[in-house]
Every structure is written in structure tokens, then in C-alpha cells.
Regions:
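Alpha-helical interface subdomain recognition
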Residues: 1-82, 87, 99-104, 115, ...
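Short, structured patches in soluble enzyme cores that scaffold and shape functional sites
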Residues: 122-124, 150, 166-168, 181-184, ...
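Short Gly/Pro-enriched turn/cap motifs at secondary-structure boundaries
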Residues: 126-129, 152-155, 169-171, 197-204
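Flexible, small-/acidic-enriched active-site or ligand-binding loops
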Residues: 133-135, 187-216
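A structural signal for short hydrophobic beta-strand segments in well-ordered beta-sheet cores
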Residues: 136-140
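A short core secondary-structure module
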Residues: 143, 147-191
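Long, acidic (Asp/Glu-rich), low-complexity accessory segments flanking structured domains
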Residues: 212-230
Length: 378
């Protein structure tokens, strides 16, 4: 059983209330208009759940990873795009929290707690799963000049602060990668298109173009060449957050399918009384609960500092939860029949949203590779 203290329960109840009263009524419109919900960002910030992982000295609440996973889950039950805003904020913030100097943390982290947005920029057109093939390069020492291109960057064009990875010494391979903090409006930074996506349409994904992007040395995160450890630590937590999002999305789809089955009458009775429907819902519920428990266990390992278990369990949680969400949302559409396929009902949106979670933060095939390597230690 998961035991939360009174304060944690209050925070989680606040997240559930925001999901129910603020996010859910906006979810369909956000998806239809492909609209970034600034109003929801403001509500998240006002209630302390935009950056809950931050220590109190930087404006956060010092939440555990388990509590943050539960917050993401609550929001994702009604709108996966809005949950992705929380995830992207954490993804962009954590490289600074994990590796930044005290001065860098004091400069940027409090603003993120108040509503400024962050982004995590590693992926490139030719460097997705194979991140070491990135082509973004730097030169200089006191002032760095960075050139290259990033793509599919969540929050990219709206972020005030970007944690960006580049090679400072390509000849060193993984040991030649360094992260930097890039500010919106920096000289040499420009934006391409915001992607037109199948799902998660309330979240912005952008191209970033870097042409002799000027970054002062004090905006380097950690020492030169230490970026791969920072990158992998951040990716592990990204995968945990994606798993929590998938669990919430699956639970939201179950809730919709159950409510529909109780009121939909066919053959003179609610379809909830049909064994075939009961079997489908039972499988959906069991799969989601299993994914939830694995996700919570991964979060606990992070909270407990069991670093040797984190990569494997975060990867397992991510692929199990997202595969479950894809299956559950598909079955929710099936339970609701023709109505489930219509945009008048949220399970249509949920099914489209679920697909991305099998892809981002590392495809589920790569996640299985990570787990296999951890098991065999190769």
C-alpha cells in the first residue's frame, strides 16, 4: 500500500481538484484548436504543482518523485497534454537541479516555480535513440558559440529556459557532451515550426536552430564533458514521468468506458451486464493497476537513492505503462463502439494521445534494450 502523510494527501487532492474543475472542461478544446493552455500553466504555478520537485529554497515544495508521479497521473486522467506540460517543465529543470552551480540554480529555478517555462533539448533530426550521433557543436571557452539543430523539443518555442546538450569535444564521444542553459531570445537562437501532431495537441513541440548561439561560460551546467551522466539521469526520471502519464491516461479511459457501459442499453439491459464487456474492463483494470505499482516502485527507488536500480525500473515502468495505455485506450474505444470513435467522447483523444508515450523519452523498443543490458550487465 502507498501511504502518504497529511500534507502529501492535501497536495494530491489539490491536483485532483484542478484536474476535475479546471483541466477537464478545457481538454477537448485544447486538442481541437491545438492550443497551448497558458491559463492552465498559471493555475499549476499558483497551486505549487508546476515545479513540485524543486526544494523550497527555489520556490518548490520539495515533493518526492512518488508524489510528483501521482500528481502527473491525476492530471493525465483528464488531459494528457496538460500532464505533459508538467513533465516538460521537470525535464527542462532537472539538468540544472542535478548539475548546475548554486549561482545557476538561484538564477533560473525560482522563475520556473513562478510560471516561466523550461525545455529539454537533446533530440536532433539525425539523433534520436542514438543520441551520441548529435551534430550540435560548440567552440570557445569564456563565451561558447553553439551551432546545430534540435527537433521535437517539448515547450521549445514557449520556453524561457532551455537545457541544451552539445558536443564540446566530439572526439571524446560520450565524454565530450556538455549541457548549457540557454535563455529565450539568446543571440543565435531561432525557431522553426511547431509540429502538427496526431495527439498531445495541447503541447508544443518545436524545431530549434542554433547559429553561433552565444552562451556565457557561467551558463554551462557542470564541467565540460560531464553531460552524459546529467543526460542519462534526466532521461531516467523522464521515463518515470512518462509512465505516470500513461497510467493516468489508462485510468481515465477506464473511467469513461465504465461510465458509458453502465448507461448504454442494448438487448434490454446495460452493456455493463454483458460478460464480454466485463472481461474487457477486467483486463483493462488489471493491466493498469500492474503498471501503476511498477511505476510507483520506480519512483520509490529514486526517492530512496537506489541508483543501481533506477535505469532498469524506470525503463520497465515506461514501456509497460505506455503499452498498457495504448491497449486500454483502444479497448475503451471498442467498448463504446461508434460513439468511442467520435470526437464528442474523450476516449478518441485518449487513444491518439497514448501513442506518443510509446515513443518519447526513448521508444519502447529501446526501453527493452535498456532493461536487457541492465539484466545481463553488457
Amino acid at each position: 500500500m502507498i501511504a502518504l502523510d497529511a500534507e502529501q494527501n492535501m497536495i494530491l487532492a489539490t491536483a485532483a481538484r484542478i484536474a476535475r474543475e479546471v483541466v477537464k472542461p478545457r481538454a477537448a478544446e485544447i486538442d481541437e484548436k491545438q492550443e497551448f493552455p497558458w491559463d492552465i500553466v498559471g493555475v499549476f504555478a499558483e497551486n505549487g504543482i508546476l515545479t513540485p520537485l524543486l526544494p523550497e529554497e527555489y520556490g518548490g515544495i520539495g515533493a518526492s518523485y512518488l508524489l510528483f508521479a501521482m500528481i502527473i497521473e491525476e492530471i493525465a486522467k483528464v488531459c494528457a497534454s496538460s500532464a505533459l506540460i508538467l513533465i516538460a517543465q521537470a525535464d527542462g529543470m532537472l539538468p540544472i537541479l542535478y548539475g548546475g552551480s548554486r549561482e545557476l540554480k538561484q538564477k533560473y529555478l525560482p522563475g520556473l516555480a513562478k510560471g516561466k517555462l523550461a525545455a529539454f533539448a537533446a533530440t536532433e533530426p539525425g539523433a534520436g535513440s542514438d543520441i551520441l550521433s548529435m551534430r550540435t557543436r560548440t567552440n570557445g571557452r569564456d563565451v561558447y558559440k553553439i551551432s546545430g539543430q534540435k527537433c521535437f523539443i517539448t515547450n521549445g518555442s514557449v520556453a524561457d529556459v532551455i537545457s541544451l546538450y552539445a558536443y564540446t569535444d566530439p572526439d571524446k564521444g560520450a565524454r565530450g557532451i556538455t549541457p548549457f542553459v540557454v535563455e529565450k531570445g539568446a543571440q543565435g537562437l531561432s525557431y522553426g515550426r511547431n509540429e502538427n501532431k496526431m495527439g498531445m495537441r495541447g503541447s508544443i513541440n518545436s524545431e530549434l536552430f542554433l547559429e553561433d548561439l552565444v552562451v556565457p561560460a557561467e551558463n554551462r551546467i557542470g564541467r565540460e564533458g560531464d553531460g552524459i551522466g546529467n543526460l542519462m539521469s534526466t532521461l531516467n526520471t523522464c521515463r518515470l514521468f512518462a509512465a505516470a502519464q500513461a497510467v493516468g491516461l489508462a485510468q481515465g479511459a477506464i473511467d469513461e468506458a465504465v461510465a458509458y457501459a453502465k448507461q448504454r442499453v442494448q438487448f434490454g439491459q446495460p452493456i455493463a451486464k454483458l460478460q464480454s464487456i466485463q472481461f474487457m474492463i477486467a483486463d483493462m483494470a488489471a493491466g493498469t493497476e500492474a503498471a501503476r505499482l511498477l511505476t510507483y516502485q520506480a519512483a520509490r527507488y529514486i526517492d530512496e537513492g537506489k541508483h543501481h536500480l533506477v535505469p532498469k525500473f524506470c525503463a520497465m515502468a515506461k514501456f509497460i505503462a505506455s503499452d498498457t495505455a495504448m491497449r486500454v485506450t483502444t479497448d475503451a474505444v471498442q467498448v463504446m463502439g461508434g460513439y468511442g470513435y467520435m470526437k464528442d467522447f474523450p476516449v478518441e483523444r485518449m487513444m491518439r494521445d497514448a501513442k506518443l508515450i510509446q515513443i518519447y523519452t526513448g521508444t519502447n523498443q529501446i526501453m527493452r534494450l535498456v532493461v536487457g543490458r541492465e539484466i545481463f550487465k553488457v
